[in-house]
Amino acid sequence: MTTKGILGKKVGMTQVFTDAGELIPVTVVEATPNVVLQVKTMENDGYNAIQLGYQDKREVLSNKPEQGHVAKANTTPKRFIREFTDVELGDYKVADEVKVDTFQAGDIVDVTGVTKGHGYQGNIHKDGQSRGPMAHGSRYHRRPGSLGAIINRVFPGMKLPGRMGNKQVTIQNLVIVKADVENNVLLIKGNVPGANKSLVTVKSAVRPPRPKQSEK
């Protein structure tokens, strides 16, 4: 299965109505044309992939290697550069533009972004644990509790207070509601990770849902 992908910016959420009057909450992703900066092949690089650049960056903020890399594609330095593997290399050439019309309404996609950061939080907020008794006699209210009858160290992965959010998350099997080529906008059903104006990666679903028996 070949993969399609594009880089974009999360704008926010809104809602659209179908012809039947059904309300659908959607996330608006602005995806201005991405530029193909490099086409990697098995012979030269050991794997097949394309490298896309998104969002122009001032030359004064880029070094010489960055400027030389994008000069091969006859474009300006890019703020974000990502690779997409398992693509059909014959469909891409260096300096080509990838637009939102690479997707169509009804396509199933995976969306990757960095979640909002919430700073240092306790167990109740961070992991959804329960409080202790709040009566006057109790001395246990919002503490983590016992770590168990284990050796004198903390095992990795235990739920303890710490930093919450600001992690890369992928939400799978979201549906493209509309691809607006004129405005360079994708409408994706549901919510996607990240704050408004943050970078998101939209690509073909890795494990799309199986069709139901009635749809076969």
From Swiss-Prot:
Coiled-coil residues: none
Stretches for region Disordered: 119-143
Domain of life, per lineage: Bacteria
Pfam families in the record: Ribosomal_L3 (PF00297)
Transmembrane segments: none
A biological process from GO: translation
InterPro entries listed in its UniProt record: Ribosomal_uL3, Ribosomal_uL3_bac/org-type, Transl_B-barrel_sf
GO cellular component, one term: cytosolic large ribosomal subunit
GO molecular function, one term: rRNA binding
Alphabetical UniProt keywords: Ribonucleoprotein, Ribosomal protein, RNA-binding, rRNA-binding
Subunit structure: Part of the 50S ribosomal subunit. Forms a cluster with proteins L14 and L19.
UniProt similarity note: Belongs to the universal ribosomal protein uL3 family.
Function noted in UniProt: One of the primary rRNA binding proteins, it binds directly near the 3'-end of the 23S rRNA, where it nucleates assembly of the 50S subunit.
Protein name (database record): Large ribosomal subunit protein uL3
Taxonomic source organism: Levilactobacillus brevis (strain ATCC 367 / BCRC 12310 / CIP 105137 / JCM 1170 / LMG 11437 / NCIMB 947 / NCTC 947) (Lactobacillus brevis)
Gene, per the UniProt record: rplC
